[in-house]
Regions:
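Mature catalytic core of soluble alpha/beta enzymes
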Residues: 2-323
Length: 323
């Protein structure tokens, strides 16, 4: 797994001067650049995310993040309490349709001034790749977690994989959250509460609305989604933050179990995401012994145009959770 993560870092990091993505961004406006199969896959995954979300998840936001001061690893940028000297600047987004990819030639061409940021998809894609490789070698059920994004492969342990969902995956057990179990597929959380810093007099975060070039200012501070893969879960959770109030109907239409935390801290559960408290009682009364199964393995969303797969085998409550 460490080899997979290291390979993605070398190919897809925006913060490494020696990364392949940095070389691609530096070549913007020039001739198409031949890239490795890994970076080609990562760029195509990012463009797929843009297409499936109508541009709400757009990899051409790199320049907007740089304008906000997110031009180096977040550990160096700092968090709320750390300041970027310049006032908030908003950069125009060129748009994902300006990226030209030739899969047969393995080339990518960026328009002049475009800088790709693959943060919304590359980590989740790495989790899916890592868990597939681990399953191939281990021959048993595997769960991989990369920075709060989860991918599974193979048969789960009895009762499923226990995962604690919170605003911040680094938080301790004293923080509000919920225990759930996942039997297959992927789970991802997108949040405006973790990567935050001061730019001028404003507090900003890394989830950019491509329509404005500024941090998304929607109804939700955190969204968790279960889907058929970690990549699809992260695409949906990121898009939901950007879409704001429009996200509820969209997630429902895709039958993607979701947990949405509003800016005031109130929580919404959609499309079969288990509620707190009484779900186990209901399941015991039914006698099914399998909890709140919400989707069938491999089922695509109704109508199919989105291409985002529904949760592979269900999300279930793990006790009453935490308040």
């Amino acid at each position: 797994m460490t080899e997979v993560v290291a390979a993605f870092d070398r190919a897809c990091s925006r913060f490494r001067q020696d990364s392949e993505l940095t070389g691609l961004n530096d070549a913007a406006g020039r001739a198409p650049l031949r890239v490795s199969p890994l970076l080609l896959d990562a760029v195509m995954a990012a463009l797929r995310a843009a297409r499936l979300t109508g541009g709400d998840v757009d990899p051409t936001i790199g320049q907007a993040l740089i304008a906000l001061g997110y031009d180096r690893d977040f550990g160096s940028v700092g968090s709320v309490g750390s300041a970027v000297a310049d006032p908030v600047r908003v950069a125009a987004i060129a748009g994902w349709r300006t990226v030209r990819v030739d899969p047969e030639a393995s080339t990518v061409r960026l328009a002049w001034g475009v800088k790709l940021d693959l943060g919304a998809t590359a980590k989740a894609l790495a989790a899916d790749r890592a868990v597939a490789l681990a399953f191939q070698h281990a021959g048993c059920g595997v769960l991989v977690s990369l920075g709060g994004d989860f991918a599974t492969s193979g048969a789960p342990p009895p009762g499923g994989w226990s995962i604690r969902v919170t605003d911040d995956h680094r938080s301790g057990f004293e923080e509000p959250g919920q225990w759930i179990t996942v039997r297959s597929g992927g789970l991802a959380t997108s949040s405006t509460t973790v990567r935050r810093w001061h730019a001028g007099e404003r507090t900003v975060h890394h989830l950019i609305d491509p329509r404005t070039g500024a941090p998304a200012r929607g109804a939700w501070r955190t969204v968790s989604v279960a889907a058929g893969s970690c990549l699809d879960a992260n695409i949906a959770s990121t898009a939901a933050i950007v879409r704001g109030e429009r996200a509820e109907a969209w997630l429902q239409s895709l039958a993607l179990p979701s947990r949405l935390v509003a800016v005031d801290g109130s929580v919404r559960h959609l499309a079969g995401w288990p509620s707190q408290g009484d779900d186990l009682t209901s399941c015991a009364a039914i006698g099914a012994g399998t909890g709140m199964t919400v989707a069938t393995a491999g089922v695509e969303s109704a109508g199919g145009p989105t291409g985002i797969s529904a949760a592979a085998a269900g999300v279930q409550p793990m006790g009453a959770g935490l308040a």
